[in-house]
UniProtKB/Swiss-Prot annotation:
It comes from the Eukaryota. This is Vacuolar protein sorting-associated protein 26A. Residues 306-327 are annotated as: Disordered. Belongs to the VPS26 family. Keywords: Cytoplasm, Endosome, Membrane, Phosphoprotein, Protein transport, Transport. Acts as a component of the retromer cargo-selective complex (CSC). The CSC is believed to be the core functional component of retromer or respective retromer complex variants acting to prevent missorting of selected transmembrane cargo proteins into the lysosomal degradation pathway. The recruitment of the CSC to the endosomal membrane involves RAB7A and SNX3. The SNX-BAR retromer mediates retrograde transport of cargo proteins from endosomes to the trans-Golgi network (TGN) and is involved in endosome-to-plasma membrane transport for cargo protein recycling. It is found in: Cytoplasm; Endosome membrane; Early endosome. The lineage of its organism: Eukaryota, Metazoa, Chordata, Craniata, Vertebrata. It comes from Rattus norvegicus. Residues 316-327 have a biased composition (Polar residues). The modification Phosphoserine is found at residue 315. One of its GO terms (cellular component) is retromer complex.
Amino acid sequence: MSFLGGFFGPICEIDVALSDGETRKMAEMKTEDGKVEKHYLFYDGESVSGKVNLAFKQPGKRLEHQGIRIEFVGQIELFNDKSNTHEFVNLVKELALPGELTQSRSYDFEFMQVEKPYESYIGANVRLRYFLKVTIVRRLTDLVKEYDLIVHQLATYPEVNNSIKMEVGIEDCLHIEFEYNKSKYHLKDVIVGKIYFLLVRIKIQHMELQLIKKEITGIGPSTTTETETIAKYEIMDGAPVKGESIPIRLFLAGYDPTPTMRDVNKKFSVRYFLNLVLVDEEDRRYFKQQEIILWRKAPEKLRKQRTNFHQRFESPESQASAEQPEM
């Protein structure tokens, strides 16, 4: 049985079946148009193997070809320049020499311990994808079919995970101290913290914590930043008083974020910020942003099997935003 669909050409159907398709886990990913796709899930270093099945739809016909091959491809595509895709992985297996097909055939393939250095990603301006590509080479028009796969990059617990503690404010008007329990969170983690009001001389009407995602594509003058508010957490609605302490508890699991991705193949980055927003009675907005790291925690079963993962934990420099006045 095939789990990856087929290509209906004029003569034959191209189909791929993974050797472990019955047991391999699948993962979901949102496409650029908001739809959810489900594909087989792989990790860095895992082999990819299976069969390419060519099924003739019209018995008695002949299919001349200049060779048949399968490729494992890792590719980055910038949506504003779709003609300029970049392949960071391209492995090729030749399945058949030039000749002709007169009946259905199957070909085994295996890509051993494939390096998959980045996480699959679809964002506002960029897509990083992995796929198997089967090509029947012909003189005029090749028969081609692509089968998407999803790759997750796993990480071990960071050795250092300091809390974030800062005192910010507006001179002689407002001073607050905020604290988050960690600076690095796994994707199912809970952000725990508190806000303490040291001085309150302006009337605050509303206060919230936002989780902001910034997708940065390109380099130099051609850099584009897409900002998206992933989550909002209302801290308070009403005026605080001096000495008041307000707890924070934000569950990341409900928002399905991606891991932090830094300078992926010199093409793009994905960074996350906690944005503390205050609104006064004159509807003026004050904010303070702090960058955090998000990482993908390995499942218990895989943690026992592996001790080394490619993702490293660094301390990115905070990136100030020019969208609103900062406290």
